[in-house]
């Protein structure tokens, strides 16, 4: 390897691949170091306290051939935590189904009725299944925005397997309410419940330094952070006005 007689094509390819991966790893290390420096030099900002905001917030759970028991279980846990806080009636939960299997859809409906019976007084829970799942998840959310979005100030878009604490949901609501220029606030998802060895390794690394990496990425982005597709609170009106994109042909 790498003999004095010259560098072969294979050796050139190895050097190129190592160089590319080194750049990627170095970028991640620099990003984490930036977050550490900020942590050490800037005082931690306390969570906002006081009277809660009056915004109406919709929790949206798009589902497509998911386990109804798991979805309703996570939804129930979030609703129960929200019910223990103030102004819980400002929140409503929507299960937005694109499921095609009639038997699975029937199971979803049964799980929904059970969920609605257990939710706290004043909290609305809805289930909607589209007959035609045009444009997949994007179309699912678009359908909700066009049909129900005008009744809510913000939407918290979740994945089918998302589980957020009531405190996290309320803090996202507080932060969005306090910053009138913010259109979207992205949370930092944390992996839980991994079963495989690789999944456990990812979960461990996510717990150890994932939050630092996320803070570093936020430093690069400043006020123009990206949307990861779930676990973020979004102001509905600006989203309706500016975020509809033409189909890519």
Residue ranges and their predicted role:
Residues 1-51:
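N-terminal membrane-anchoring/stem segments of glycan-assembly enzymes
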Residues 30, 34-249:
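Internal catalytic domains of large membrane-associated glycosyltransferases
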